[in-house]
Every structure is written in C-alpha cells, then in structure tokens.
Amino acid sequence: METKTLFDSAGQLYQQTHIAHWDAVARKRDSWNGWGGHYHRRLAEIYRFLITPGQRILEIGCGQGDLLASLRPSRGLGLDFSASMLERARAKHATLEFVQADAHDLSSIEEPFDFIIFSDTINDLWDVQRALEQLRHVCAPSTRIIFNFYSGLWQLTLALAQKLNLAAPMLPQNWLTPSDLRGMLNLAGFEPIRGWQEILWPLPLGGFANKFLVRLWPFNEFALANFLIARPQPEPVKEPTVSVVIAARNESGNIKAIFERTPKMGREMELVFVEGHSRDDTYAAIEREMAAHPGSSSRLFRQTGIGKADAIRLGFEKAKGDVLMILDADTTVPPEDLPRFYEALRAGKGEFINGVRLVYPMGKKAMQGLNFLGNKFFSMAFSWILGQSIKDTLCGTKVLWKKDYGLIAANRNYFGDFDPFGDYDLIFGAAKLNLKIVDLPIRYRERTYGSTNISRWKHGMLLLRMIAFAARRIKFV
C-alpha cells in the first residue's frame, strides 16, 4: 500500500511495518483464536446498545469485519490497510463493503455516515490528529464517532498475555488517555459528548464484573477499555421554525399571560395547546385568547389520554416546527426565557436543552423543601446513570429538534411507557441516542394561579422505581 504521499520516511516505515504485522496476524487467526473472543463479544454487546440496527456505519480499522457485521447496518463500510484482513472480511461478510485504505487519508470516501467506529484502532495510528481531521467530510451534523481503546494500566497484562500466546500480538502502542483524545478531538473540530470505562475481566465468567462492578468506583479505574463518543463541532442553524407545546390542565388563569408574554422566535412560531380534562374552563380560556390574538399562530387539541406525558406526545405529533419546545402552562418558568433555549439549540450548544431550576434562588413558595431535595437526589442519580450532567430532571421546559424527537419516539419501545410526566421519556431517549444534553439555568417563579398537579409522595415513589428501571436499561447493560 502506497504511503509516501502521506508521511515522511519515519511515517512510511511505521505504516509498512504495521501493515506487515496485521497481515501476519490475519494469517495467524486462520488457525488460532486465543482468549480474545470473550473481549470482542463484550465489545459487540456494547456497540449494539449504542447503535440501533439499520444505521449507516463506517468502521476504520475493521479487521475481519466481525464487529461491523454484528451491528446489522443498512450500509456498512469497513476500511483497513491490511489486505489480508480484508480478504477474510469479504469472505465472511459478503453483504458488507470493505475497502483497503489508510485512516490518514479518507479522500476516496465521498459519503456521510450515521456512525464512525474506531475500535482498538486509535492507539495504533502514526498521526492521530491527522486521522481525526480526515473524518470531517464523512460526517453529517448528527454523526457520532465512537472510540474504544485500551487503558495504559493494562500494558503489562496485555504484554504478558501476548507472550503466553493468549492475545493477538501488538506493536508498540500510543497508549492515549481519554484526556489526550479529547484534546485531539477538539483540535480536529470535534466535541466529546461522554466517556466511560468498560470490561474488567476479558475472560470467561466475566458477566458480573463487566456489567456491574465496572460501573462503580474504584473498580472502573481498572477497566481494560476506555470508551468515548464525539460529534462534529456544530454550525449554527439559520432561523428554524418553532413550535411551543403547552400542556394545560386547570390553568385557566394563566392562558392570557402565555399569549401575551411568549416572545416570537425563529422564522415562524406556533403555540400548540393540549388541554387535559380540566375542572375549570381552561379549554374555553384558550379559545377566547386564540380569538383575541388572531395574529398569533396557535392551535388547540383536547387530550384523549391521561397525564402530562400523553399530552406532550400529542402536542409533539401535531407540531409543525423544526424546533420543539415545552412550556409549562403554570408559567413558573417565564415564557420570556424561551429565546435562551432556542438560541442554545440553534447555535449548536446542545441537541437537547434542559431547563434547570436548582441553580438560582427560588421564590419562597416556588418549590417546597422536600420537593427541592428530591429533585436534587434524582438529578444526581440520573446524571450518574446517563453519563451526562443533568441538574434538574423535572423542570418542564425542554427543547429539542423535531427530527431527534422522531428518533426518540421510534425507539421508545426500548424503555416502554413508564413515565407519567414525559420528562424521563425524553431524557432517556436523548441519552440513548447519544445526543448532547445541555443544562440551561432559569429562575423558577411562584405560581400565580391554581395549584400543582403533582402528587409528591406518589410520584416520588414512582421516580425511585424509574431509577432502578433506568439503571437496568441504561447503566448496567
């Protein structure tokens, strides 16, 4: 394989040596498996959790293509510089495409992918930053790049395993730390989303260690594999359209303020009201204000199901905007704050903008003490489970792209219908899609009309069950 146009003489020698090495490893694997099968099967399990079937996937350093094939892509392209590896990959996985190419030069690839995988590849590269820079033209704005790479703590253990012929031989590695890779990603135009550790015991009978202990400190510090997910640094979106969805139940006295106080955002904006079996005249109040504000684009739907989550889903289904916003009808989150959420999403600061009530001091009656402590506990628990900081899980104001909500809804059966609020349905779904979640602090105000529709103790117990559920479905998998 020609490398003289990419590197100086030292780089060329490095590449030639590594190509010859991996060609030899490919031939060796025809009659030898070692003990690495347990490790690679666990890697495949992790990637199948991260990537749903039917995605467009590029794997760089694909070897014999087993990981790529296990993900059932709609379009699977594997790249490797070892001709011997690719010969075997094509024989094993005829439905996938395999191309001999160098990770440092992807100019021959002219299509974007949903996911790009570097599985135990990054530590074997001559110039990591250059390889990362090559990714820009094969990325869409929503592309996710997933890396897994050995921890430097395992250098001696892996060297011993190779000497005992239990693991495939490796040439000297870069032994990057997660911090090293984050820095290089930033230089290459990418933004890390989250990182974590996997696999304590890459041998038989490792289930408990690899699915439970590795999630806990201090055991996670000794894991074999570092994982990191990144996205392209975003470009601002110019003037998207906006739908503000308001679920209203027993909020008649707040409707006028919503019409009068909600600022205009985006190229076009609509208010989408979903009225939920009110005991007061909320529905009629919305109709009156719609008639009184003919210049506002607004629509009203009567909820057929029960609960806020059901109302929000109906509103999102009916919404026409590119951007979906939730505004609580009690206006305890001021409508005047919505442009901050809009701008954070439009500018690419995050893909799921989550309101936070717990940063600024609150009004005296805005949130009772037990509710405040409960929200603090739940935010800490869910931040740990999801791997991204979420300071307030039950602030009603959340903003995301409609296209991303469509993906959340399409994958909702993974979690099931468990959330009466709708907050966790969206948060879990966003985390499962590896969306960038960003907290946006707001000042939480006192109610000026009505009383809360939340039953503190009943819903608190439900949320405890949801923590256990989320831990099983997201953390300990």
Where are these regions (language model features)?
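A conserved acidic beta->alpha catalytic loop
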Residues: 275-284
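Hydrophobic helical membrane-anchoring modules
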Residues: 2-5, 210, 214-242, 246, ...
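A conserved beta-strand element that flanks and buttresses the S-adenosyl-L-methionine
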Residues: 117
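Conserved donor nucleotide-binding strand/loop of the catalytic core
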Residues: 99, 283-318
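Acceptor/aglycone-binding surface of glycosyltransferases and processive sugar-polymer synthases
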Residues: 154-169, 174, 303-318, 326, ...
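Class I SAM-dependent methyltransferase SAM/SAH-binding core
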Residues: 63-105
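A short glycine-rich, Lys/Arg-flanked "PGG" loop and its adjoining helix->strand segment in the class I
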Residues: 129-144
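Conserved class I S-adenosyl-L-methionine
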Residues: 2-52
